[in-house]
Amino acid sequence: MNTDKISVNPCKSVAKTLVIADYPIGYASGFGETLFNLFTGFPREKLWSAHPGHNVPADGKQHAQSISLLSPSRPRWLPNQLSLAYYPFLKAQQFQAARQAVRILEDTVQRNSIKNILVIPVSPWILSAALTLHKLIPRLNLVLYVMDDWQGHHECHQLPYSRRRRRLLSEVIDRAHVRFAVSREMAAHYEATYGKRWQVVHNGVPKDSLTNGTNGTGAPRQVLLAGDVNEFRFDAVIAFAEAIERHNRRRGQEIEFTVMGEVAEQHRSSLSALQAVRLLSRRSHSECIESMKAADLLYLPLAFAERSARISLYSLPTKLPEYLATGKSVFFHAPRDSAVFRVAERYNLTPRLATIDSEALDTFVDAWAEGKQNGGETIARARSALLEEFDIMRLAARFQAAFV
């Protein structure tokens, strides 16, 4: 499997499109990878990506013409405990950044005769700039794509989800001609809440990419989480890591749990204190794929904490289809009502667990180490999931049809 070489027939009728978001197409994250794959085959000369200048696409992933915006942020040297005191200054910077962004975006649209704008809600000032642009040039075909539930994003990071921000999102939804959600659950919720039609698109892989990834004949040793660790998944990750640590001490085994991604500063010490855990930074997409193929178990967690409830409920992790395509065992560890757990239930993908209870995790780890929870019989089910929900050619065609 190599999603760097996906071949999608470009839509000849697509019009010039400007993407306005926090991260560029091809950025080294789930956000950037998903956009890169969904825009596969889209003519580069018809695609612009406007984003804060400090975020850049990964090597070999620059599929659009970049428009650099300001990057207002708290200074790195400022201690976390002073972040609230700095907040008024940050708001002033964001206000100025939004005003400048509108001027840059308006000039880009007019100078290049752009017809479509794709807006992805993350930072309020960027969303506000996109809305202002559409008010100035209402002829633009506004397409909205929600990757992370915006209210959930605020709650998870303990940010104020003010009435003004709720109105901002509601107005963008109302003005959009096409709306995309990242999961069935998110689409259903938004249709019920806002009374509009929502389509579903997310990351995918080529339909012929599934490999028969055998897990080897020896005792399982390598567990891999390919992704970042933040508030969206930390409580699940630490509970699972501690269960592996307890198992190693009881059984004298050396199961190794590798995290290949960025770990939030506030969580790094808790994980690095465990002997079973190996923390790596983000790696190239190709290196990540190779590590997946070499692992005995691929770990797919989402948080159980109340503050992360909406994110867990509606999100669909970028790595899900890539995990399935390796043919390796995937451990679905998420709340039972979450979109990702429901995917596992739809196709009876195992192993899966909907709790962070220590006894339940101990039981799972012990059984997995003995080869009783390897999920090896689910390759045919993984193939069904990939064909029915994660075929990138179908997803990209659905997505790009919005930009005519």
Feature names for model-found ranges:
Residues 99, 106, 127-128, 136, ...:
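Membrane-proximal helix-turn-helix segments that form the acceptor-binding/catalytic region
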Residues 2-70, 244-247:
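N-terminal subdomain of nucleotide-sugar transferases
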Residues 53-55, 172-198, 341, 399:
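A short, active-site helix/loop in glycosyltransferases that binds the activated sugar's phosphate group
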Residues 141-143, 151-171, 207:
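Nucleotide-sugar donor phosphate/pyrophosphate-binding loop at the beta->alpha transition
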Residues 185, 203-204:
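Carbohydrate-associated surface elements
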Residues 232-235, 286-291, 298-321, 330-342:
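Nucleotide-sugar-dependent
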Residues 355-362, 369-403:
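A charged, aromatic-enriched C-terminal amphipathic alpha-helix characteristic of glycosyltransferases
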Residues 207-208, 215-270, 281-286:
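Conserved catalytic-core segment of nucleotide-activated headgroup transferases in glycan assembly
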